[in-house]
């Protein structure tokens, strides 16, 4: 019966997009305020029916210092507790609830939509189509999801506390497929995870998928992973266990195998208008004058010549990923419908992939244009109308000043969450330089932002580490961008004799002297090198550094997210070099299959996993138990009088917390002077004063004092 209900939902979802009446209009030439000579026809045509039933070098001393010792009695299987039930909303109130939400946002939504498409004479028709289908998706949203929406509306700060712990993973690498993942939910709960980010799992062509970011069908799961029914069942089971699901939504482009792309390739003008097609290179050359390349070495250029159609198509990422034309309102509408469809399958957090790139304009760099913010603002309002329990996570891997605007304003918010990408990059910069000044500056900048802004904090993810640092600040110390990037990459790839890190470069561009970095946390901390050398002291110290970096990440303001495998110190996987589909992409170095054999060691204290996993478990529980880690609690840095030691303070009415982190290979003294009583180190249980704290090489303290 459950399966039949799910199938009925699928059928209803397909029909919702397909039933919009699309009377033929006369062809239209859209003017673009003379900023570019692109003509886009936007005849209102029948929407595509998408089938969903197919279904400076460093001397590394190896001074003997004990790794963290943590008492661990938690060896029993995790007890799965169901999330507390939310009172159901009477069905008769559904329409009034929807009308109230719509009325709250309608004027602004209309204004922004009509302003964005003011040159389109059919703008009113497109807007009405959008509003009509929004209501249909609301009607199809099941009661459990509506109840969750209602509960979260009553507590809009539900994601800003200290109770969310995230993990990101590839389904196939972790458990084979969606059903396999469902069978591993006990382990995920044992990792204290209640925010599960599943890397791209929608239909994409094998060998031309860009790790799943070349989507051929937004309403179909990759066949090797299962079906959309399997996904909906997984989200339902996760919700019963209090686990929120995050899923990537690739906005900038589709695969060349998408139905729209196929019809465009066959010469259908209305589908070519959903992308950027040109008969010759005249207009593309204007774009290329100011638009940087995303992948200058692996996929140079912003356009691809299609021999079969004798046209150029815009492909800013890979040649098989065709950029969508958001100047066409049909594109925006259809992509919003796809987002709402995924929300109705139980997605709690929608990750807006490559969102800064979605609006193109000649004479600009085609990044972070005002129209992008207009679209994200509209998406936020549409979610608040149809599915207000859903969060938007913006993937904005840009310079710091470009990231924050994607939060919008307090009155007109855009994304709920953003990646704390600059702090992540600054952390690894500190690992390589052993100088915390840049990291401290970055933390101070984040601390100065409104507390409504919530960042997603992380050490590693599926992607590379890009060196988007504050070079204006570094130049004050005579540090120049290009040679400094080279030093960072050389250190973290182990080119210096005494470097402990083992990483690989990604997209090395000799012309710019630029490259990005790949590798797992454990390999970058030295566990790989010292393990290979059978240097037990070195391994213990590397484990300590791994713990310290995670402790620092967990003590920041926001939501911590661990990359699957980091909890068991998984090392680089070099086997990708033997796979023709992966060999050219070094990011697969840290995308290897999850090592379940290593996970079995997590309760054996003599193993690497037994020394790491229990400490991370304790840190995560401490964070959830102490209100001082709430996202809305202010954070500030304090002087330690040592360039290698970082100290941060978080304080509310109940507690005062001081986190101290040693980024040096030497034992140090943190010359802090918080003369306000005795503190307890939450990690070891020791009591000490927050004055002249002795801290081991690559070690840390979590000092806490209760005020009441």
What residue spans do the PLM features occupy?
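Long, intrinsically disordered low-complexity tandem-repeat segments
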Residues: 14-82
């Amino acid at each position: 019966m459950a399966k039949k209900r799910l199938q009925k939902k699928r059928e209803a979802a397909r029909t919702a997009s397909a039933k919009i009446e699309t009377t033929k209009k006369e062809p239209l030439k859209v003017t673009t305020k003379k900023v570019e000579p692109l003509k886009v026809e936007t005849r209102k045509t029948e929407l595509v029916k998408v089938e969903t039933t197919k279904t400076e070098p460093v001397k590394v001393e190896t001074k003997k210092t004990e790794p963290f010792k943590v008492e661990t009695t938690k060896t029993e299987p995790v007890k799965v507790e169901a999330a507390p039930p939310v009172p159901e909303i009477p069905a008769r109130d559904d329409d009034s609830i929807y009308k109230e939400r719509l009325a709250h946002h309608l004027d602004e939504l209309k204004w922004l939509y009509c302003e964005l498409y003011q040159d389109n004479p059919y703008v009113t028709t497109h807007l009405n189509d959008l509003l009509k289908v929004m209501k249909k998706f609301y009607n199809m949203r099941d009661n459990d999801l509506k109840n969750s929406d209602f509960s979260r509306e009553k507590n809009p700060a539900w994601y800003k506390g200290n109770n969310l712990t995230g993990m990101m993973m590839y389904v196939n690498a972790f458990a084979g497929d969606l059903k396999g993942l469902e069978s591993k939910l006990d382990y995920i709960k044992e990792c204290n995870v209640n925010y599960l980010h599943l890397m791209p799992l929608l239909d994409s062509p094998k060998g031309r998928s860009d790790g799943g970011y070349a989507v051929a069908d937004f309403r179909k799961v990759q066949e090797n992973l299962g079906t959309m029914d399997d996904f909906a069942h997984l989200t339902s089971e996760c919700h019963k266990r209090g686990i929120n699901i995050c899923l990537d939504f690739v906005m900038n482009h589709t695969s060349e195998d998408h139905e729209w792309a196929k019809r465009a390739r066959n010469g259908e003008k209305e589908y070519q208008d959903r992308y950027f097609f040109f008969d010759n290179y005249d207009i593309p050359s204007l774009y290329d004058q100011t638009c940087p390349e995303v992948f200058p070495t692996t996929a140079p250029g912003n356009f691809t010549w299609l021999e079969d159609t004798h046209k150029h198509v815009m492909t800013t990422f890979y040649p098989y990923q065709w950029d969508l034309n958001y100047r066409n309102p049909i594109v925006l509408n259809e992509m919003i419908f796809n987002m709402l469809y995924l929300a109705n399958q139980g997605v709690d957090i929608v990750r807006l992939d490559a969102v800064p790139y979605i609006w193109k304009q000649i004479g600009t760099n085609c990044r972070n244009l005002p129209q992008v913010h207009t679209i994200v603002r509209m998406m936020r309002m549409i979610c608040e109308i149809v599915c207000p329990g859903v969060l938007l996570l913006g993937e904005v891997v840009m310079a710091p000043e470009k990231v924050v605007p994607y939060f919008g304003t307090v009155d007109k918010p855009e994304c709920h969450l953003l990646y704390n990408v600059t702090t992540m990059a600054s952390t690894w910069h500190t690992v390589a330089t052993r100088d915390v000044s840049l990291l401290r500056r970055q933390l101070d900048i984040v601390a100065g932002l409104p507390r409504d802004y919530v960042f997603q904090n992380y050490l590693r993810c599926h992607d590379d580490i890009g060196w988007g640092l504050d070079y204006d600040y570094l130049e004050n110390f005579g540090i120049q961008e290009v040679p400094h990037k080279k030093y960072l990459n050389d250190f973290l790839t182990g080119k210096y004799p005494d470097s402990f890190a083992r990483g690989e470069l990604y997209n090395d561009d000799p012309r710019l002297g630029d490259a990005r970095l790949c590798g797992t946390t454990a390999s970058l901390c030295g566990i790989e090198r010292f393990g290979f050398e059978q240097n037990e002291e070195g391994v213990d110290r590397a484990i300590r550094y791994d713990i310290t970096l995670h402790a620092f990440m967990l003590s920041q303001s926001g939501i911590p997210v661990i990359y699957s495998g980091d909890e068991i110190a998984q090392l680089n996987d070099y086997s990708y070099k033997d796979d023709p589909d992966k060999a050219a992409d070094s990011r697969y170095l840290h995308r290897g299959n999850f090592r379940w054999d290593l996970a079995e060691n997590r309760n054996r204290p003599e193993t690497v996993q037994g020394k790491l996993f229990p400490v991370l478990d304790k840190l995560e529980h401490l964070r959830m138990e102490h209100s001082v880690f709430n996202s809305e609690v202010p954070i500030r840095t304090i002087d330690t009088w040592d360039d290698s030691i970082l100290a941060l303070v978080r304080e509310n009415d109940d507690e005062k917390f001081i986190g101290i982190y040693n980024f040096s290979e030497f034992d140090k003294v943190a010359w802090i002077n918080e003369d306000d009583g005795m503190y307890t180190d939450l990690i070891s249980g020791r009591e000490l004063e927050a004055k002249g704290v002795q801290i081991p090489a690559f070690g840390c303290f979590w000092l806490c004092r209760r005020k009441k």
